[in-house]
Structures are given as C-alpha cells and as structure tokens.
Amino acid sequence: MKEKLTNNTFQVNEKGYYGKFGGAFIPEILHENINRLQKAYKSIIESQEFIEQYYKLLHDYAGRPSPLYFAKRLSDKHKCRIYIKREDLNHTGSHKINNTLGQILLSRKMGKTRIIAETGAGQHGVASATVCALMDMKCVVYMGKTDINRQNLNVRKMEMLGATVIPVTSGNMTLKDATNEAIRDWCSNPDDTHYIIGSTVGPHPYPDMVARFQSIISKEIKSQLPEKENRNYPDYLIACIGGGSNAAGTIYEYLYDNRVKIILAEAAGQGIHSGHSAATIHLGKIGIIHGSKTLIMQTSDGQIEEPYSISAGLDYPGIGPMHAHIAKQGRSEILAIDDNEALSAAMELTRLEGIIPALESAHALGIFQKKQFKTNDVIVVCLSGRGDKDMETYYK
C-alpha cells in the first residue's frame, strides 16, 4: 500500500534515513570506520580536487559519456520513442565502474590500502578489481559459489586483474551470503581496509554515496536529450532494480521533476507467489539487513527468505532504502518481471537492435511486455550492462 506523500524529500537526511528507511545498524567494531566515513565522504567527494580527478577518470578511463541511443526498431514495435542509455559500453561492461572509481579514489584519500567487495553477477567484482589494478591496491572479492558457477567468465577476469576471489558456501551461496562474508572480513580488518559496497544498500553513508557516484547516468541523460527531443526530460525512466544502484543513477536528477514517471523492474523469478522470486518491494516487510532498515523478504517469524532470480545481480532479499522510500511514497511504479519475460525481452532487443543485454537489464526491457505507452511518449531505459557474462544462460 502506498503511503500518503507528506514530505517532498527523497534525499537522505543527516542521520542517514530516507523517511523511515536507512540508518546504520552495525557491529561495534565497525563504528569507528563508519563514523569516519560518514564524516569524511561529503567533504572529500564535494572538493574541487576530487571532482576533477573523478571526472577525468570517468572520461579518459571509463569512456564516458555513454551514448543515449534511439532504438528505432524497438520503438516501432512498441509504438513509442525508446532511448537506451548505453551503460553496457562503459569500460568493464556495466554501470558498476562509476561507483568503483569514486569509492576507491575516496578510500585512497582516507589512507586505506586494501579493498574488499561483494559481487553477484560479477560486474561489481570486475569493476573493483579493475580500478584496484589501476590504483595499485590489494583487492579481495567475495562471491557466492552458485554465482561463481554461473558467472565463471567474470571470475577469470577478476583473477587476471590480480584480485583474490573467495567462494562463499554458506546459505544460498549468492549475493546476500557474499555480503555477509565481506562484512565479516571488514570487522577483522577495520584499519587498512575499505569495503566497497556495489549497490545503494548497507549502512549510511553507502546508499547515498553510491547513488551520488551513479548519478552521472541521469546527469548525462539530461544533457543528451535536448539534442534528440528538444527537451531535457523524458516522459518515463525505466531501470531494473536489485539493490538499486543503476536505478538510483538513472532517476537521481529527475526525482523532483513530476513530469517524469519512474518505472522500476524487480525480479519475479518463477512468479511473485511461487516461493522462487526476488520481488522485494512487492513482498518485503520492514526489517534490518546488512546494516540498513529497509524492505526485506522475510518468513512469518522474521527470518530472511532466500531470493531467486535467473539474474545473479538481482537475487538480493533486500532493497536500497532510497528505493523503499520512493516506492512507498508513490514516486516510483514497481513492476515484477519473471525469468521468461526477461529472456524474451533480451532476445527481442538482440534481434531488433543488435544489442545483447545483461540479464539484469533484460528485466527493465521486460516492462514493454507489461505496459503500453502512447505514440509520443519519450522513454529512456538504462541498459545497465552487456550480456557477455550471461551467454551460457541464454544458450540454455
């Protein structure tokens, strides 16, 4: 049920909350690290020196700006004007490098020498290992064994880049479990280590920090659209949502623009009520996961349910607190896309436009099977990553 819109703010407050979601619920051993990060991150990332270094890396190393591509054949089929924000063309093949460049640059300025990361689909792990190689920092990546088996190409990339990939065999052996192990590592190594969370989840300031680094996506959309549509806003923004980083980046600059409707696609897996899904916003109840108060898939007695999605990057049982807040406020519409709908949408884009999307991004494209748009609607879809890593799944 949507809550009445009583407060026109979608940004984090000084205590790390988006409405009633967020905060920092952490072990005592991490208090000093988190407090130091909370105090330092804004002053560092808002400094002119940091901004210049960060944007130079985005341009020269990551290859930004990423193109805003008019998908004519896809538009003709669905009878609207569809633009694709090509995050798949960034260095490392996804939006993840926007965040890893920012966080690793930040961690160096804070005197850290070792980076740990969690990864599901492997894209955040590859992006972390890539930037660590660039900046000569040690890198350890935690990855569930289930995800290692289905994303082996990315594992090889991480190892080639010099990272140590540690298989996680607890729980469902996916993203949630990898995150648990990364947090344990950080508790054991608080002095020299920075934990680089890949999504808008975790304790404050991570959700805000990751959203800020990913906001380059919507900044570019705003500057690119006028050349194509003679206005700087679309009618709709569409993105997939697991933890919420690419979605946060896609909508960040438009949150207060009521001309722009926001539609986010979460993973329905084998069906919302099948017991095998990751549709957290549809099914979740308020709880605490990985240091944040948010919506979580839970059993009746409060145990976290194991999520499922064909996409390794979307099977997370929680959601970023910003997204929990804007969904409950009615600012975003959430649609659940199942495995088959995502696979069908991936094939459609591939055959019509010659672009093979990541399975995560395919969920966003699946919205066109669920919803009809008007002929003159301008729609921007964030293609968060490329599909190389998912070829074995597509072939099945």
Swiss-Prot record:
Q: What CDD domains does the database record attribute to this sequence?
A: Trp-synth_B
Q: Which Pfam families match?
A: PALP
Q: Which GO terms describe its molecular function?
A: tryptophan synthase activity
Q: Which residues carry this modification: N6-(pyridoxal phosphate)lysine?
A: K96
Write down any Gene Ontology CC term.
cytoplasm
The cofactor(s) it depends on are: pyridoxal 5'-phosphate
The pathway noted for it is:
Amino-acid biosynthesis; L-tryptophan biosynthesis; L-tryptophan from chorismate: step 5/5
- What InterPro entries is this protein classified in? Trp_synth_b_CS, Trp_synth_beta, Trp_synth_beta/beta-like, TrpB-like_PALP, TrpB-like_PALP_sf
EC annotation?
4.2.1.20
- Sorted UniProt keywords: Amino-acid biosynthesis, Aromatic amino acid biosynthesis, Lyase, Pyridoxal phosphate, Tryptophan biosynthesis
* Keyword Magnesium appears in the UniProt entry: no
Catalysed reaction equations from the record: (1S,2R)-1-C-(indol-3-yl)glycerol 3-phosphate + L-serine = D-glyceraldehyde 3-phosphate + L-tryptophan + H2O
What is the role of the protein in this entry? Answer: The beta subunit is responsible for the synthesis of L-tryptophan from indole and L-serine.
Assembly, per entry = Tetramer of two alpha and two beta chains.
Q: Which family does it belong to?
A: Belongs to the TrpB family.
Instruction: Name the PANTHER family on file.
Output: TRYPTOPHAN SYNTHASE, TRYPTOPHAN SYNTHASE-RELATED
Entry protein name: Tryptophan synthase beta chain
Q: Which gene encodes it?
A: trpB
